[in-house]
């Protein structure tokens, strides 16, 4: 059996779908469906069971899985809202919960692959290499992720099974509808074009011209590919960047969406006051450690990925069961 926490979420549901494509349906989905929307991500997936995240936590604390053959745990479940400022809540959900799942996997020698975040690099002024010298946190979400990364580094020497943390950069692609304002810029711009025939980007700030802030945007299929590559190849434990290593400006993103949809123009809006001092104007993964681990499967070209994503959205926007 394979366990995917956050399996009804964006990246988790994509991992499940790819596992299905590879013939695996013996999957336990762990999530919380209370928002009434993310259940839609499950309709096109094949899995043997579902468990609420609180019940799953109780199960691992009670050792209810003793004797169950678990091949891997993909821990994608988290609160990823960068505008959530309840630090106690963030630490409970993203740090304490993750520690419980980690120690369960260590105890039973189950590969543990988890979602970290490029937000742990703060402003990025020290670079984007995995390690304390580059890391910082601009918001509670980033702090909760950074705290867990640091905890993992402490326990790695005593681990007898694989532990892999992947610092996701800006992920985009199918099955992110439910994320609302936290969905990728690609999804936001797709909807803007549908409604107004325009895409609205931030004006310049901190020395950047209008729309010229740059991020490392990574297609969700590539994120899934990196996860499964580490697991299937029993690659070395550690914390790795999961980004393309090449940044693109928001102007490039806006134009890619316009080109994919065949219509539209770009306009600029004032940079929000609430984000000043808390916003990453530039991100770009340093891929050295990922490549050193042996990963050689590459990443999608952004324009091609955007066209594929737009076509997916135009054709219903959710995975189909059995396809």
Residue ranges, per PLM feature:
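N-terminal Rossmann NAD(P)H-binding glycine-rich loop of SDR-like oxidoreductase domains
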Residues: 2-22
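SDR active-site strand-loop-helix element
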Residues: 5, 30, 73-77, 112-118, ...
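Catalytic helix-loop patch of NAD(P)-dependent Rossmann-fold dehydrogenases
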Residues: 92, 96-100, 107, 120-165, ...
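NAD(P)H-binding glycine-rich loop region in Rossmannoid oxidoreductase-like domains
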Residues: 44, 53-54, 58-93
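Glycine-rich phosphate-binding loop and adjoining beta1-alpha1-beta2 segment
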Residues: 29-57
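C-terminal substrate-binding subdomain of Rossmann-fold SDR/epimerase-dehydratase oxidoreductases
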Residues: 194-323
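A short helix->loop->beta-strand "cap" motif at the edges of active sites that frequently abuts
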Residues: 24, 108-110
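NAD(P)-dependent short-chain dehydrogenase/reductase
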Residues: 126, 150-229, 256-258
């Amino acid at each position: 059996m394979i366990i995917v926490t956050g399996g009804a979420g964006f990246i988790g549901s994509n991992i499940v779908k790819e596992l299905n494509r590879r013939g695996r349906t013996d999957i336990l989905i762990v999530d919380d469906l209370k928002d009434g929307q993310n259940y839609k991500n499950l309709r096109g997936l094949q899995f043997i069971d579902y468990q609420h995240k609180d019940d799953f936590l109780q199960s691992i604390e009670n050792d209810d899985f003793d004797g169950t053959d678990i091949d891997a745990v993909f821990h994608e479940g988290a609160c990823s809202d960068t505008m959530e400022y309840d630090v106690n809540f963030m630490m409970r959900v993203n740090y304490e919960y993750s520690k419980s799942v980690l120690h369960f996997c260590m105890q039973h020698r189950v590969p543990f692959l988890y979602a970290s975040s490029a937000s742990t690099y703060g402003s990025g002024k020290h670079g984007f290499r995995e390690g304390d010298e580059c890391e910082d946190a601009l918001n509670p979400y980033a702090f909760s992720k950074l705290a867990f990364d640091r905890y993992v580094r402490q326990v790695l020497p005593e681990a007898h099974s694989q532990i892999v943390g992947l610092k996701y950069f800006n992920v985009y692609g199918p099955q992110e509808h439910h994320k609302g304002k936290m969905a990728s810029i690609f999804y936001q711009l797709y909807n803007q074009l549908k409604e107004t025939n325009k895409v609205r980007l931030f004006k310049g700030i901190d020395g950047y011209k209008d729309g010229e802030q740059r991020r490392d945007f990574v297609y969700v299929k590539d994120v899934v590919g990196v996860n499964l590559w580490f697991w299937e190849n029993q690659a070395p434990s550690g914390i790795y960047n999961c980004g393309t290593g090449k940044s693109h400006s928001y102007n490039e993103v806006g134009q890619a969406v316009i080109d994919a949809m065949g219509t539209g123009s770009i306009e600029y809006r004032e940079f929000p006051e609430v984000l000043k001092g808390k916003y990453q104007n530039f991100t770009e993964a340093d891929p050295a450690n990922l490549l050193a681990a042996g990963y050689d499967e590459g990443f999608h070209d952004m324009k091609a990925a955007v066209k594929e994503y737009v076509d997916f959205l135009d054709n219903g926007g959710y995975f189909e069961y059995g396809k």
